[in-house]
Amino acid sequence: EICACLVGSEMCIRDSGYTKPIEDKLDQMGIVHTCFSDVAPDPSLASAKAGAKAMTAFEPDCIIALGGGSAMDAGKVMWMLYENPDADFSDMSMDFMDIRKRVYTFPKMGKKAYFVAIPTSSGTGSEVTPFAIITDQDTGVKWPLADYELLPDMAIVDTNNMMSAPKGLTRASGIDVMTHAIAVSYTHL
């Protein structure tokens, strides 16, 4: 039996109908699935741990992160914690440095589930990067995770997701892209 876990950013992704075509296709294929949509726009470690706990109970073979960068980043952390429940977040998270010079070796991913990223906006590129940003709700610190193990196994970029997005989301995504471009010009690698 194949099982899939759909990670959506907030209930608005589900309420906007983005999950329906995917859920319909999974039903049509006879794939048992569930949806975890308790992901805030600025995902917290607590939310990621709750998602990983739900995944552990459901035991999916495939994790589908649908939404913007928040859903994909949260999905990556959930995937990491689902695959490696003993992994220590404090070891994985650190101020950003060259991804090739990390002092922590991430555990191998993909033993339990494939990770598929489907963006609904074009702001972060998280669907094709080995990075995730997650906020430690206890300290308020946003921590970057950087390792090639966090690369999704597959990215499905459907332009219909962006073309049907509300104008406000499209504007915010454009500003997000510009912010990332400016930030990278000031980053010392």
Q: Which residues fall in each region the model found?
A:
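A generic structural signal for short coil/turn motifs at secondary-structure boundaries
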Residues: 1, 25, 164-167
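Single conserved hydrophobic/aromatic residue that forms the stacking wall/gate
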Residues: 1-8, 13, 188
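A short N-terminal beta->alpha junction/helix N-cap motif
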Residues: 9-10, 14, 39, 166-169
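Glycine-rich His-Gly loop
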Residues: 10, 68, 120
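N-terminal small/polar loop signature for handling phosphorylated ligands or for N-terminal nucleophile
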Residues: 17-90
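A glycine/threonine-rich phosphate-anchoring loop and its flanking beta-alpha core
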Residues: 85-186
